[in-house]
């Protein structure tokens, strides 16, 4: 037994004995910490008897390989792995802890901020492998915010009063291409709104509702750096960051301006494709409207040539302007200015014809007097509609005419008038029509 051999040596030979033991080669794959308790106690007793006053020399780097070493050292724990995210996606200690926040090693674990942000942000995919912050960290999320995202707490209020809209706020996706930045920044702005930071987002005039705090600026910088890697940023974003790498607010302001410009472009295209003109508005106003739209689109990189513009304009013409589609649609070299010359000519002709017409109205009393003084020179023909009517049904004018003619001079006309109405009446007209009572 080696332990008995160690007890027989003198104190002076303890060093050589230890050297012989440590220099002995042990061909084994046994864990250096897997040593039985009995062997460990025997070694400790032998070492104490051999040298009770001399301190034990620390083991060398080769000692953990010896299973008989008396004082095992704790094994070093390897640093935790960072999951599927590469090392370059992590922020440094100085970047992640600028204002006293605890260091976080995983990009999905956004720091629990003083203004009650969500304690954990989950990236897309399985979430069971990612640890969560304990429930004791920070203040519990007790008072939810409005769902609208447009009403935000004032920065002058206490930090504890600012709570997150949801317990877990969905983070924006990772930016993977410079072409996807316009769509990505929309989701990032929505992420800030859900995190009670809508008040720091620039408005239409380029100014935020309230002043951003230092902690909020740090959070803005950290989240932008995590979810928008620098290699996928557009050139204009890199130019801003090259001047000031923390000026995320300027990037958001420029992005909002570009969104408004894109919206204006879409509206201009829709307006140009749905033009309508019939002369109800001045031709000058119509021309100004169309030319301004074409100029804005050309300035924004959407070029509208004369052929396309003329086709869109002529398609919306109606009324007297409609014939312009057929008179000049074959002219390939026609410009917008030439088309508007024709439109102006038709409009001026319409205005001239309207001005030449009398614009006065006759007095109603004059019309009444004219109707009274009007005399009918033609003698209307009398046609019996009902043969069963008696002579009393004749008009007063006919009876007066019969009386006057019978008193003055008798003639054959009187006999024709006194004839029965049941006889057919012959009309003196060119068609020689006859009306019979039984056929009427």
Curated annotation (Swiss-Prot):
Stretches for region Disordered: 1-93, 126-173, 352-440
Record field: compositional bias (Low complexity): 153-165, 402-418
Segments of skewed composition (Basic and acidic residues): 429-440
Keywords for this protein: Cytoplasm, Phosphoprotein, RNA-binding, Transposable element
Location(s) in or outside the cell: Cytoplasm
A GO-annotated cellular component: cytoplasm
One GO term of the biological process aspect: viral translational frameshifting
Residue pairs linked by disulfide bridges in the UniProt entry: none
UniProt site (Cleavage): 401-402
Region called RNA-binding, residue ranges: 299-401
Alphabetized GO MF terms: RNA binding
Polar residues bias locations: 1-23, 48-60, 127-152, 419-428
InterPro entries noted in UniProt: TYA
Modification Phosphoserine, positions: 416
Function: Capsid protein (CA) is the structural component of the virus-like particle (VLP), forming the shell that encapsulates the retrotransposons dimeric RNA genome. The particles are assembled from trimer-clustered units and there are holes in the capsid shells that allow for the diffusion of macromolecules. CA also has nucleocapsid-like chaperone activity, promoting primer tRNA(i)-Met annealing to the multipartite primer-binding site (PBS), dimerization of Ty1 RNA and initiation of reverse transcription.
Miscellaneous note of the record: Retrotransposons are mobile genetic entities that are able to replicate via an RNA intermediate and a reverse transcription step. In contrast to retroviruses, retrotransposons are non-infectious, lack an envelope and remain intracellular. Ty1 retrotransposons belong to the copia elements (pseudoviridae).
Subunit structure, as described in the record: Homotrimer.
Domain topic, free-text comment: The C-terminal RNA-binding region of CA is sufficient for all its nucleocapsid-like chaperone activities.
Descriptive protein name: Transposon TyH3 Gag polyprotein
Organism of this sequence: Saccharomyces cerevisiae
Gene that produces this protein: TY1A
């Amino acid at each position: 037994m080696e332990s008995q051999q160690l007890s027989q040596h003198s104190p002076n030979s303890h060093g050589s004995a230890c050297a012989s033991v440590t220099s002995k080669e042990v061909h084994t794959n046994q864990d250096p910490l897997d040593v039985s308790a009995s062997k460990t106690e025997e070694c400790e007793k032998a070492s104490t008897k051999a040298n009770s006053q001399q301190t034990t020399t620390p083991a060398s780097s080769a000692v953990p390989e010896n299973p008989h070493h008396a004082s095992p050292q704790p094994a070093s724990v390897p640093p935790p792995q960072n999951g599927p995210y590469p090392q370059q996606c992590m922020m440094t200690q100085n970047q992640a802890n600028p204002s006293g926040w605890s260091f976080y090693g995983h990009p999905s674990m956004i720091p629990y901020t003083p203004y009650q942000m969500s304690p954990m942000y989950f990236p897309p995919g399985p979430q069971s492998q990612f640890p969560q912050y304990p429930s004791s960290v920070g203040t519990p999320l007790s008072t939810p915010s409005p769902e609208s995202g447009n009403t935000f707490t004032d920065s002058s209020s206490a930090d504890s009063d600012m709570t997150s809209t949801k317990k877990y706020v969905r983070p924006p996706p990772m930016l993977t291409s410079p072409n996807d930045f316009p769509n990505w920044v929309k989701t990032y702005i929505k992420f800030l709104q859900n995190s009670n930071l809508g008040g720091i987002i620039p408005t239409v005039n380029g100014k935020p509702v309230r002043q951003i705090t230092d902690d909020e600026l740090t959070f803005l910088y950290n989240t932008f750096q995590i979810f928008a890697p620098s290699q996928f940023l557009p050139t204009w974003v890199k130019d801003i960051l090259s001047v000031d790498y923390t000026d995320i607010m300027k990037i958001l302001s420029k992005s909002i301006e570009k969104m408004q410009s894109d919206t204006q472009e879409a509206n201009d295209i829709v307006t140009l494709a749905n033009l309508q003109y019939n002369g109800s508005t001045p031709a000058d106003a119509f021309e100004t409207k169309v030319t301004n739209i074409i100029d804005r689109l050309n300035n924004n990189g959407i070029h509208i040539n004369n052929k396309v513009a003329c086709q869109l304009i002529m398609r919306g013409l109606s009324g007297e302007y409609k014939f312009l589609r057929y008179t000049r649609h074959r002219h390939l070299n026609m410009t917008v200015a030439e088309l508007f010359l024709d439109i102006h000519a038709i409009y001026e002709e319409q205005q001239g014809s309207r001005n030449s017409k009398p614009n006065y109205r006759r007095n109603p009393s004059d019309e009444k007097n004219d109707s009274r003084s009007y005399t009918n020179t033609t003698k209307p023909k009398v046609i019996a509609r009902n043969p069963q009517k008696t002579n009393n049904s004749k008009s007063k004018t006919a009876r007066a005419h019969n009386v006057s003619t019978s008193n003055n001079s008798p003639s054959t006309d009187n006999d024709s008038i006194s004839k029965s109405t049941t006889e057919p009446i012959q009309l003196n007209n060119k068609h020689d029509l006859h009306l019979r009572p039984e056929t009427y």
